[in-house]
Swiss-Prot record:
Its main location: cytoplasm. SUPFAM superfamilies: Elongation factor Ts (EF-Ts), dimerisation domain, UBA-like. InterPro entries: EF-Ts_dimer_sf, Transl_elong_EFTs/EF1B, Transl_elong_EFTs/EF1B_dimer, Transl_elong_Ts_CS, UBA-like_sf. The lineage of its organism: Bacteria, Pseudomonadati, Pseudomonadota, Alphaproteobacteria, Hyphomicrobiales. Associates with the EF-Tu.GDP complex and induces the exchange of GDP to GTP. It remains bound to the aminoacyl-tRNA.EF-Tu.GTP complex up to the GTP hydrolysis stage on the ribosome. This is Elongation factor Ts. PANTHER family: ELONGATION FACTOR TS, ELONGATION FACTOR TS, MITOCHONDRIAL. It holds the Pfam family EF_TS.
Length: 306
């Protein structure tokens, strides 16, 4: 199979590995990009798991909260300049308010925009003409608890409840809701910083777990040690993996000497009753969106030729 220069460049951008290593990885995996990333990781050449999540898109994350509930939305724009526009910010804030009532992306898109007979989708389409850029309502989600609090945090907020990264944390408790919300906000800040994969180990996608095990096994076998020792090595690395990606097992950012789970237990004294983190949501602007890269020099040359 012929491997193109574009494929090699894409793999290099994802992993930071050398061109020859990227070409070898693609040859070994018949051009399968995901398998090539794993091949490089197994060889110890790539730190792709840290780089593959890089994404790019503009717009804002919006957060709105009520009594024991909160919602988070993402509305995209073409440029960061528009994201700083007051009219655009008002749209995102209003969409977040709608999300607090309707929750899901589909329901919010079809719901009436505040103060209008038009839907959220149609209102955003109309705004394209006035703001002068392509805009899009991408997603929304909501968390609710019967008792307790849903805490919120917006990182580097450009306005109240608006920024590039928004987090919700649901804490169920019959204790003091103000104390639960205060601790929940600390956990939300932690989630913003660490981006855990799941709340508990059981909630991690089994395919992701098996993938990590396979990579750790291949890495351990390169040591040449007996199978029994390799098994112990893999167990140790999986334990560390869970400590890195499972929220409750992570070292608490505000006090790295304890886990989030232990911090929750300690917070129960202030809350005045048993408490449980039941869910969290983390919306980072542009996750999973590939932003088209443009060659400025080529654009200028093309414009001159017209």
């Amino acid at each position: 199979m012929s491997i193109s220069a574009a494929q090699v460049k894409e793999l290099r951008d994802l992993t930071g590995a050398g061109m020859m290593d990227c070409k070898a990885a693609l040859n070994e995996t018949n051009g399968n990009m995901e398998e090539a990333v794993d091949w490089l990781r197994k060889k110890g050449i790539s730190k792709a798991d840290k780089k593959a999540g890089r994404t790019a898109a503009e717009g804002l994350i919006g957060v709105d909260a009520g009594v024991r509930e909160a919602a988070v939305v993402e509305v995209n724009s073409e440029t960061d300049f528009v994201a700083r526009n007051a009219a655009f910010q008002e749209i995102v804030a209003n969409v977040a308010k709608v999300a607090l009532a309707y929750g899901t992306t589909e329901a919010v898109a079809a719901a009436k925009y505040p103060g209008s007979d038009k839907s959220v989708t149609d209102t955003i389409k109309d705004a394209v003409g006035t703001i002068g850029e392509n805009l899009g309502f991408r997603r929304s989600a909501k968390l609710t608890v019967p008792h307790g609090a849903v805490a919120t945090y917006v990182h580097n907020a450009v306005a109240d409840g608006l920024g590039k990264l928004g987090v919700l944390v649901a804490i169920e408790t019959t204790g003091n809701e103000h104390a639960a919300n205060a601790f929940g906000r600390q956990v939300a800040m932690h989630v913003a910083a660490t981006n855990p994969m799941a709340l508990t180990a059981e909630q991690i996608d089994p395919a992701a777990v098996e993938r990590e095990k396979a990579i750790f096994s291949d890495q351990a076998r390169q040591s040449g040690k007996p199978e029994a020792i390799i098994e112990k090595m893999v167990e140790g690395r999986m334990r560390k993996f869970y400590e890195e990606v499972v929220l409750l097992k992570q070292a608490f950012v505000l006090n790295p000497d304890i886990t989030v789970e232990k911090a929750l237990k300690d917070a129960e004294k202030e809350i005045g009753a048993p408490a449980k983190i039941t869910a969290y949501l983390r919306f980072a602007l542009g996750e999973g969106i590939e932003k088209e890269e443009t060659d400025f020099a080529a654009e200028v040359a093309a414009a001159v030729k017209k």
